[in-house]
Amino acid sequence: MNYSRSELLFQEAQKAIPGGVNSPVRAFKSVGTDPLFIEKASGSRIYDVDGNEFIDYVGSWGPMILGHCHPQVVAAVKSAVDNGCSFGAPTELEITLAEMVIEAVPSIEMVRMVSSGTEATMSAIRLARGYTGRDKILKFSGCYHGHSDSLLVKAGSGAATFGVPDSPGVPQDFAKHTLTATYNDLESVNKLVAENKNQISCIIVEPVAGNMGTVPPREGFLEGLRSLCTEEGIVLIFDEVMSGFRVAYGGAQELYNVTPDMTTLGKIIGGGLPVGAFGGKKEIMSLLSPSGGVYQAGTLSGNPLAMTAGIETLKLLQTEGFYQDLDRKSDYVASGIAKAAKDAGFPIYSTRVGSMFCAFFSKKPVYDWTSAAACDTKAFAKYFRLMLDEGIYLAPSQFETAFVSIAHSTDDLDKTIAAAAKAFKSL
């Protein structure tokens, strides 16, 4: 394939934008090539500025569960634009989407809309601190919760891709309030809680870790966190920015039947437009300004375009059999890629939860950040480039999740498996 215009645009972008991109992982650094510049997308396909067509498993990093440019969502957003893009004032649309989220997500009794997942997690932690009167938070190595200062300690996603566990610019005074445990290891959590008795405001966790690849929770892990938080008066926060409305309509908490105190959301609930949300028990959420003293605000929070896209997306997700069909497609492609690797004699460790999946370039099981970090990232980089040349667009990092959309056809999935088989044989 020819990528000459993308290469030219990347050179231009680096003169005006730090690193040439507006989010680090997009730079393709860890896969040893220049990024694609995208012109348009439709359904399961994405098209670059050189006219190349790709089957897309990035899906804008998760939001595009319906595929790109779903006609019903596009029509609704176009209609909303005619009424105004943003008012900085309440609208009925905010109530509609809030009520849909409350009905869907078991833990949410009240919800506040924001404009990004980072805002959601940052605000949820502030609220948990205000509710408990405690300063410390506990997170897990390899779990990414956005780029607010206190959460950039041993983070996943882009931070993992670039091998930077702690970002310069984060004061030590911030970091000292952040405790880090091992994902899927209750013993490490119990130890930290015991050492910091009555000091921890919240435990924040991705119930399905999606920012070090796709790492499911081990049996009893989420249940153990729930019990511990109840016993110790700690607010349990599920970061479902990625898994919310993705692994089930009610998110991972519905799938695993574990209810946190608070939940953060994003991605899918905005239908491809900038959005975030955090919600939980009324007794906690009522402490938010203006009803309480914990401050949070945003110019574009609850803007009518994102609310409209979210409402239409959630309506479509309620279609009978939607998640069963999506699960079938996801199982088909994930197991097909795993079989292709096995047939080629190339060792991978395959994981999947709903329509999130990952092919770890590892001979051993992956269940936490240490085991994920041991993967052969150089082999993955070669695999990524081979797949790209076959018209398959994957996330440009071993430490990211692949997403299946309802728009992926059986033909798309078969082409993906065939491309993987060819790539593994080359490796």
Curated annotation (Swiss-Prot):
UniProt keyword Isomerase, yes or no: yes
Cofactor needs: pyridoxal 5'-phosphate
Record keywords: Cytoplasm, Isomerase, Porphyrin biosynthesis, Pyridoxal phosphate
Matches recorded under InterPro entries: 4pyrrol_synth_GluAld_NH2Trfase, Aminotrans_3, Aminotrans_3_PPA_site, PyrdxlP-dep_Trfase, PyrdxlP-dep_Trfase_major, PyrdxlP-dep_Trfase_small
Biological process terms in GO annotation: protoporphyrinogen IX biosynthetic process
Chemical reaction(s) catalysed: (S)-4-amino-5-oxopentanoate = 5-aminolevulinate
Record-linked PROSITE patterns: AA_TRANSFER_CLASS_3
Pathway assignment: Porphyrin-containing compound metabolism; protoporphyrin-IX biosynthesis; 5-aminolevulinate from L-glutamyl-tRNA(Glu): step 2/2
UniProt feature coiled coil, ranges: none
Compartment(s) where it occurs, according to its Swiss-Prot or TrEMBL record: Cytoplasm
GO MF assignments: glutamate-1-semialdehyde 2,1-aminomutase activity; pyridoxal phosphate binding; transaminase activity
N6-(pyridoxal phosphate)lysine PTM sites in chain numbering: 267
This protein's record includes keyword Oxidoreductase: no
Domain of life: Bacteria
Family statement: Belongs to the class-III pyridoxal-phosphate-dependent aminotransferase family. HemL subfamily.
HAMAP family in the cross-refs: HemL_aminotrans_3
The protein's name in its UniProt record: Glutamate-1-semialdehyde 2,1-aminomutase
